[in-house]
Amino acid sequence: MQFDESDARVWIWFEIRREDDIVELLWQSGQVVGTNQTHRQSYDPPPILRGSGSGRGEENAPLSQPPPHLHQQNLFIQEGEMYSWLHHSYRQNYFCSELLNSTPATHPQSSISLAPRQTIATRRAENFMNFSWLRGNIFTGGRVDEAGPSFSVVRESMQVGSNTTPPSSSATESCVIPATEGTASRVSGTLAAHDLGRKGKAVAVEAAGTPSSGVCKAETEPVQIQPATESKLKAREETHGTEEARGSTSRKRSRTAEMHNLAERRRREKINEKMKTLQQLIPRCNKSTKVSTLDDAIEYVKSLQSQIQGMMSPMMNAGNTQQFMPHMAMDMNRPPPFIPFPGTSFPMPAQMAGVGPSYPAPRYPFPNIQTFDPSRVRLPSPQPNPVSNQPQFPAYMNPYSQFAGPHQLQQPPPPPFQGQTTSQLSSGQASSSKEPEDQENQPTA
């Protein structure tokens, strides 16, 4: 590979993995000069003035500039060293073997250029409190150098830790950085510091890529800080509201409990009144507990039920007893009839002369006694006769017959004695016919 001075500049870009710097090698009058691409164009930003709201009379005083950054010294390589380095074999694995492209022999080129990597601008937010150059006073002016594009820093003029906020705290200053050659993208950063009272400072940096302009401008809105009295009032109102809600729920619960207790008390009073009435109805009930009183009531009801069942059994046969009830009152005081038997001797009147006046004994005609003929006796039929079931002797009545069972009442009574009734009738007729004859035969005085 041969290089002539008449050829154009040969730009050889390569990346060194050390501190993220880019070094540019230039061919100038037979020598290779290495310069840092980051600090190729140095510029001095305009002085940043303090805000008008500081109140210390330093409205137009510029901020103090930080000490200039120490640039790396240019790397000078002698011509002999450059020649040995360029004509070295590519077979060895050097750190730049992957960066340099091999040129074909048939088509030599006058210049070789390696395009740098294009970084994609991304929107990100970083906290610059982690860097050492921001640990000091944030109001000190200075130029912020980065490995790639430059940043514009905007600061507010306020004092750290101050309790008073200046009236123009929301206004911020902006700096304009002119565009430089060879840069494809610009990144403008905005540093905004808000006054947060006693809680300290919050620093936020927003980096955004702008394609063609290098102007950065920050506009911040004032933070509305509520006083302590308002926060206390709100806290009291919230606590008061919660207490009222709790009080309302507790009142409702107490009210429902009172209603339940009142209903329970009324129910118990009614039960006690009913138990007292039950004790009065049950004889010899002196129990104090409700269970014992109920047991006595159950026993008493059972006894009454058994008595009623015993009284209802004769009432079922009341239709049969009513048929002979009128005959029971007839001839109840009549003595049994006197039946004279034949062959009996009566006392003579002579034997009773000393006792009283003698009266002739009445002569009773006796009917002819017929011999007993069993053929004339009629036997009762085997079928029961409902008329024969009725008693034929109303003069003799068993007083316990009404309590007898139905099977006892259905027994047939003994057959009547027919000879006795006929003799009574004949004797009655004879006595009535002899009375006038006796009156005629009596002597007259």
Curated annotation (Swiss-Prot):
Gene3D superfamilies: Helix-loop-helix DNA-binding domain (4.10.280.10). Residues 231-246 have a biased composition (Basic and acidic residues). GO terms for cellular component: nucleus. One of its GO terms (biological process) is regulation of DNA-templated transcription. This is Putative transcription factor bHLH056. One of its GO terms (molecular function) is DNA-binding transcription factor activity. Homodimer. Keywords: DNA-binding, Nucleus, Transcription, Transcription regulation. Pfam families: HLH. PROSITE patterns: BHLH. The gene is BHLH56. The keyword Thylakoid does not apply. Residues 255-304 form the bHLH domain.
